[in-house]
């Protein structure tokens, strides 16, 4: 938690002033019962209207000062809490950006969203409440007991007995509920994960008529969450009735003792009123303290979960500068895999096993195989989204681990299977490839990606708005824009991970022809299910269950690789493969 508190360093002044002003407010509140006792004992007893007015004026003054102190404390506590949550959220988001795909896969998207939103908001609310009440409530409880001794020491002994009993109830319930709130948050994660999965795959759910089963699955998870929330709620709900019972018993005893003291002349009736007021103040503050403890318990549970993400160490380390020299015999290499294997975290079996091949600069490399054969896993190793479990991946003659992050990602641009665009304009999305690109660079990339025609047809051209996720564009348009975005950076290696699946054959062929015509020695990796898209590649890698079962040209593989021949024949018979 010390690391979490570090984000308060810019708000030390506010964190000190907020509780101090609340204590100042509480100090004035403690004088109110004494003034009321004077009104009863002196003003009313003597029928002194002037004295009553003066004391009422004092009460009004105390109320105004208390209000000013309360507003000031609220300002400082809100400023500290909001500033803290902003800094924490920024640090959390920044840390998430440093995590590798392995950590992202382990943590899960829905979990990270919960940490960034719900958990941080809960910590903010808990901190705001804590700064305002963590000193005020105990101060009023202790102060009321001390002030009671100034009124009547015998009656004040009731406070000495009552306060420890109340503390046992409050802190006992806090100890019982704190671990349960962690379980509640974990079950909330499950519900949010199911919600996200369902909304993301809503079309698949509709297509397979699985609405009822999805509702049942959600209800099961939601019922578990509800049961745990009710369990925690039932325990927390004991707080108020138990404290009220104890306070009311104490007031009854106080009235009994007070009546005896009045009869023997040990105290006046106004003093009894003051003592009852002090007891009520204790009740109010203990209820606040109970609520504070519940909220702080939730906040601490959430803070622990946020801390767990911040403590997640990135699995990859990138050097600050380029390391090593390129051997002369490897100067023509673009990508070299040497006995590479990959096993994902938590997976029982490797996704890739003993893969070795070399791609020369300027070559086009096709990657083909059945579903789950490891095609995406292979190309994900090139820009170092994952580190190989065994073996070495070399980029341009150097170990991929010797490249700084920016330089490696600048050399190897990847177009993912899912075409992901961001809210903004076509221009702003393309500039992700190179923020300094000119309009000429953008149009050149669009021409190569076969996207220039439809962009020119847009009323605003490059400045045409793009909705979040590219909802206002077709699948083919989104794929071509993501390819153009990668080309804007002018990479030395371009990876198309099944990113032309929404293109027709003519557009796909035109794209491959345009890529081949680019100046320089661009190395292209094309991952595809279509044999027709790969048959003109310089090399084709054939994967089967994580193993490289064939490597060569189209004609060579048809003669030597049964897996490739089976894929080709199955598509050729359907008319999907073309010469």
Residue ranges and their predicted role:
Residues 10-13, 98-102, 118-127, 131, ...:
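An intracellular "coupling" helix at the cytosolic face of ABC transporter transmembrane type-1 domains
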